[in-house]
Amino acid sequence: DPVIYPVEGFDMQSMGKDTLFHKSYENTDISFSPNIIWVSQFNYKLKKELSLDIISKYVDEQFIDNTSSENRKLDDYLVNNLQLTYNLKLKNVNEARLTLMVNNVLNNQYSNRAWIYRFVSQGWDPSGSDPYINADSDGYNMVGHFPQAGRNYLLGLTLGF
């Protein structure tokens, strides 16, 4: 159960007395620390100077804060990328490489970061008026996610002298 500490004399724009809630948690996961991160890279040499890489990354579900609450958790995700590399032969250049990357090939919608603001409201239920707010047994959570890019392309040129 939360421990309630009244904050005497707190006054901010005539808010009067406020209450500070404190709750201790034990044996919780560390925020933004998934249990599993798996990365693989397969390289196929299509020709002597041309290669294709398939790069996959899986990240297990992870919590936004250190409470291990299901209301404050990011879903797991899998992202696949392709990289096509062509080695060029140029005069006066030791190494020349042209690279085309297609990131998030399957155009997955995922979020790998978020923020949380916890608050208590005793006279008003804000969860119906704001899509970013959900309620739990201890109060309300305002959660914002940072969605990652869908399919995107990157073209690069590497020159070594």
Region locations from a protein language model:
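Gram-negative outer-membrane beta-barrel transporters
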Residues: D1-Q62, N66
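Transmembrane beta-strands of outer-membrane beta-barrel proteins
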Residues: S40, L50-I54, L82, A96-L100, ...
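Short, well-ordered amphipathic alpha-helices
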Residues: N81-N87
